[in-house]
Curated annotation (Swiss-Prot):
Natural source organism: Homo sapiens (Human)
Gene: TEX13B
PANTHER family (alphabetical): TESTIS-EXPRESSED PROTEIN 13B, ZINC FINGER PROTEIN
Tissue distribution: Testis specific.
Source organism, top-level taxon: Eukaryota
Name of the protein in question: Testis-expressed protein 13B
GO function terms (MF aspect): mRNA binding
Lineage: Eukaryota, Metazoa, Chordata, Craniata, Vertebrata
Any matching Pfam family: TEX13B_C
C-alpha cells in the first residue's frame, strides 16, 4: 500500500480520503511506483516528471490518471512537510526573539546601572573639583598675601639706615635697667652715683656745646651737624647717670636741649638724643625730625621743633 491512513507524514487527516486516493492509484501499477519513486524529491521535480508523462502520447490514459493521483498524494505530503518545517522555523524565531528580549532587558538593566555609576562618578568628580577650586583659591590668597608681604618688605627701609635710634641700656628715673645693659653701663652708673652732684656740673659744662650746635642748625646747616666720632659714645640720662655704648661705626651726633625748645618745666636736666647715620648714607639724608622726651619718657615734641636738613 502506497499510503497509510495512520501515517501522520502523509498530510491527510481522514482515512476515507486516503482510501479513495489509494483506489485511484491502484488502477495501474505505475501509480504506486510513481509515488514511491518521487517521495524524496521536491515538488518541482515531481511536477516536471508528471508533465512529461502527460505530454507523451504513447502513454496510456490509465497510466496518466494513476500518476496524477500519485502526484496529488505527493503534493499533500510535501505541503505537510513544508508546514512542519515552517512551524519549526517559527518556533526557532520565537525562541530567538525571546532571547533577544531577554538580552535587551539585561542590556537595559546594565545601562541603568552604568548610568547610575556614571552619575555617581560625575558627582564625585564635581565634588573633587569644588574641593580643588577651594584649595586653589586658598593657595592663591596665601600667594597674594606673601607677595604683599614681600612687596612691603622690599619697600621698607633696612633697619639702622637713616632712622633715629634710641640706644638700649639707658637707666630710667626709678633706677631700673633695661634689658641689654652691660657691665660697663652698671659700672658707669655706680661711678655716677658715687660722684653725687657732679652730674649737674657735667651738664653745665656740656651746656654750651648743644647751644652752639642748635645755633648751627638754625643757620641752615652750613656748618657740620656735630662731631663724627668712632669708639665709645657717652649718653647722659635724666638723673645725671651715664651709660656707655660701644660701636665701631661713624655716627653723627645731634645735641639738643629739650627744655629750651619745649619750655617744659618738668625736665630737670637736658637730654641728648643721638641719631645714628652710617657714613655711606650721609649724602642721601634729606629731612630728619627729632622728638624730645621728658624725664618720664613722654613725648613733648611738636611740629615747630623739627629741623630741616639741607643736602650734606
Amino acid at each position: 500500500m502506497a499510503l497509510r491512513p495512520e501515517d501522520p507524514s502523509s498530510g491527510f487527516r481522514h482515512g476515507n480520503v486516503v482510501a479513495f486516493i489509494i483506489e485511484k492509484m491502484a488502477r495501474h501499477t505505475k501509480g504506486p511506483e510513481f509515488y514511491f519513486e518521487n517521495i524524496s524529491l521536491s515538488w518541482e521535480e515531481v511536477e516536471d516528471k508528471l508533465r512529461a508523462i502527460l505530454e507523451d502520447s504513447e502513454v496510456p490514459s490509465e497510466v496518466k490518471e494513476a500518476c496524477t493521483w500519485g502526484s496529488l498524494a505527493l503534493g499533500v505530503r510535501f505541503a505537510h512537510r513544508q508546514g512542519q518545517l515552517q512551524n519549526r522555523r517559527v518556533q526557532w524565531l520565537q525562541g530567538f526573539a525571546k532571547l533577544h528580549r531577554s538580552a535587551a532587558l539585561v542590556l537595559a538593566s546594565n545601562l541603568t546601572e552604568l548610568k547610575e555609576q556614571q552619575e555617581m562618578e560625575c558627582n564625585e568628580a564635581t565634588f573633587q573639583l569644588q574641593l580643588t577650586e577651594t584649595s586653589l583659591a586658598e593657595v592663591q590668597r596665601e600667594r597674594d598675601m606673601l607677595r604683599w608681604k614681600l612687596f612691603h618688605a622690599e619697600l621698607a627701609p633696612p633697619q639702622g639706615q637713616g632712622q633715629a635710634t634710641v640706644f638700649p641700656g639707658l637707666a630710667t628715673a626709678g633706677g631700673d635697667w633695661t634689658e641689654g645693659a652691660g657691665e660697663q653701663e652698671k659700672e658707669a652708673v655706680a661711678a655716677a652715683g658715687a660722684a653725687g652732684g657732679k652730674g649737674e656740673e657735667r651738664y653745665a659744662e656740656a651746656g654750651p656745646a648743644p647751644a652752639e650746635v642748635l645755633q648751627g642748625l638754625g643757620g641752615g646747616f652750613r656748618q657740620p651737624l656735630g662731631a663724627i666720632v668712632a669708639g665709645k659714645l657717652h649718653l647722659c640720662g635724666a638723673e645725671g647717670e651715664r651709660s656707655q655704648v660701644s660701636t665701631n661705626s661713624h655716627v653723627c651726633l645731634l645735641w639738643a636741649w629739650v627744655h629750651s625748645l619745649t619750655g617744659a618745666s618738668s625736665c630737670p636736666a637736658p637730654y641728648l638724643i643721638h641719631i645714628l647715620i652710617p657714613m655711606p648714607f650721609v649724602r642721601l639724608l634729606s629731612h630728619t625730625q627729632y622728638t624730645p622726651f621728658t624725664s618720664k619718657g613722654h613725648r613733648t615734641g611738636s611740629n615747630s621743633d623739627a629741623f630741616q636738613l639741607g643736602g650734606l
